[in-house]
């Protein structure tokens, strides 16, 4: 079976991209365990706790990331450079994601056959 990477690179609530990516990820996890999840650029904001999407009339889907354990999604990485650029190095995120420097992250991403970006 092909290995599938889900890359979240956009901030939450400005568009439906993050929510759609999360829905696709959870649906795909029912079919395969060969999944990897990557958070890069503004996608690191997807994992911030305490968001208030109702203030912008958006649906609160961020809590759904906490279901990764239930869906056996354990290959999760976050770009260390993106965290530094946004001052988020010492934040407790809603999921456990391993920080990787950009070179290591690209190397890990290269291990996947299909890359879906949201």
Swiss-Prot record:
Belongs to the DsrF/TusC family. NCBIfam families: PRK00211.1, sulf_tusC_dsrF. It comes from the Bacteria. It holds the Pfam family DsrE. It is found in: Cytoplasm. Keywords: Cytoplasm, tRNA processing. InterPro entries: DsrEFH-like (IPR027396), Sulphur_relay_DsrE/F-like (IPR003787), Sulphur_relay_TusC (IPR037450), Sulphur_relay_TusC/DsrF (IPR017462). Its main location: cytoplasm. GO terms for biological process: tRNA processing. Part of a sulfur-relay system required for 2-thiolation of 5-methylaminomethyl-2-thiouridine (mnm(5)s(2)U) at tRNA wobble positions. This is Protein TusC. Heterohexamer, formed by a dimer of trimers. The hexameric TusBCD complex contains 2 copies each of TusB, TusC and TusD. The TusBCD complex interacts with TusE. The keyword Hydrolase does not apply. GO terms for cellular component: cytoplasm. It comes from Salmonella paratyphi B (strain ATCC BAA-1250 / SPB7).
